[in-house]
């Protein structure tokens, strides 16, 4: 099963498991003077380009929006809606995890900070240059999905 994992944010972490686990970060920050909607347009374009490059995607998994600051939660929720529409248009299954689920699975603690998650990802994949916590979260979420779906 080909799975794309997304940690949705202005700097969206992604991870993919075919032919072997790989990942990166997509910068969705709009250019100065652009509308805020450009973030959603960039995400849709990145998803389409990624699918065109890899071919088939069976499942997209993403982190559910959560947090204390409503503006950030709303921004991520808007990105989630882009992912859902993309999946519906392309016939791709999708699911999500709460941040605490991912943290507890990866570190044993549901309230682990970004540094701990980054350390955990680097321990699991020393051969991969994990550039930030967004990529780390996407990689760990992918591993969790593989474990849940026994891939």
Q: Model segments located where?
A:
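Phosphate- and other anionic-substrate recognition elements at nucleic-acid/protein interfaces
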Residues: 1-151
């Amino acid at each position: 099963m080909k799975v794309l994992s997304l940690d949705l944010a202005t700097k969206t972490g992604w991870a993919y498991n075919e032919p072997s686990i790989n990942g990166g970060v997509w910068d969705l920050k709009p250019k100065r003077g652009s509308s805020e909607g450009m973030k959603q347009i960039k995400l849709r374009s990145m998803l389409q380009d990624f699918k065109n490059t890899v071919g088939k995607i069976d499942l997209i998994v993403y982190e559910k929006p959560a947090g204390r600051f409503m503006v950030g939660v709303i921004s991520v929720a808007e990105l989630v809606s882009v992912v859902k529409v993309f999946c519906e248009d392309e016939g791709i299954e999708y699911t999500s995890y709460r941040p605490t689920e991912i943290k507890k699975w990866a570190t044993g603690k549901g309230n682990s900070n970004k540094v701990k998650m980054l350390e955990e990802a680097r321990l699991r994949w020393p051969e991969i240059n994990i550039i930030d916590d967004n990529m780390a979260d996407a990689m760990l979420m992918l591993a969790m999905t593989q474990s849940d779906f026994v891939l």
